[in-house]
Amino acid sequence: MVVGDEAHTFKAKSLTTIMNRLVNANLRVGTTGTIDNAIANQMTLEGNFGPVNKVISTKELIDSDTLSQLTVQCLVLKYGEEERKLCRGLKYQEEIDFIVSHEKRNRFIVNLTCDQKGNSLVLYNLVHKHGKPLYDSFVEKLKGTGRKVFFVSGAVNAEERERIREITEKEKNAIIVASVGTFSTGINIVNLHNIVFASPTKSQIRVLQSIGRGLRKTEDGQGTTIYDLADDLAWKKKKNYTLNHAIQRVKIYTIEKFKYKIHEVPV
């Protein structure tokens, strides 16, 4: 018998190799809250465990009051004409580097997060280019206020992450600046009210797993708000890479029947 938790990760070569060698394991059970919509990944998953049986949706769990109420605020950052023109020919990684190092954008993230009530999780992708500078900005802004700010990356060991999680659950307005890889999957924070998507992504798994961090019901009954940052650097009719990623995320919210609103914010 094989039981695979977070079964969506079983598309990794190392795990599929193990599954292929378990020729005598006739009973296979895989559980997950998120399945990739890519056909190839679905086929791999079904090859490892068998046909998918969707027991219940996240929306149904929210409606039944099992999970916290969820609202997604899509904040489309509108850049000026000069910056749009400057970025029109950038390759994907160059666009990412421009976005994560944009001073006004990072200041907006810090101010937005600090203005929210309750505990907040800020998710980033690049540690040295984005996560650490954001953390330093939070520390500087909140100096002398007594408000706790934590930094989590792959370099922070599991024991320290657990300590941060436990401290946060006892706080009312703490901020965790964490890498997507360490805090988007498998970490449950009961007392979490706000999640800020500071870095672009179009991965359905990553988006839904990240949202899942904030769906545990809180003692105060406050719902969870997702702040999804999109970057509009479109030039004439050509959309930039990360704006297309944002469009994909909105499609995910629509499919999952999440409540969302789109707001334009000048940078």
Where are these regions (language model features)?
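Post-DEXD/H (motif II) to motif III coupling segment of the RecA-like Helicase ATP-binding lobe
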Residues: 3, 8-73, 253
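Conserved SF2 helicase motif VI
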Residues: 35, 194, 202-226
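Long, hydrophobic alpha-helical segments
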Residues: 225, 239-267
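Conserved interdomain hinge at the start of the Helicase C-terminal
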Residues: 82-125, 129-143
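Conserved helicase ATPase core of P-loop NTP-dependent helicases/translocases
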Residues: 121, 130-133, 146-187
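Conserved segment of the helicase C-terminal RecA-like domain
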Residues: 213-247
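Short, conserved loop/helix-junction motifs that constitute active-site signature segments
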Residues: 1, 19-25, 190, 214-221
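Conserved Walker B
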Residues: 2, 6-8, 183, 200-201, ...
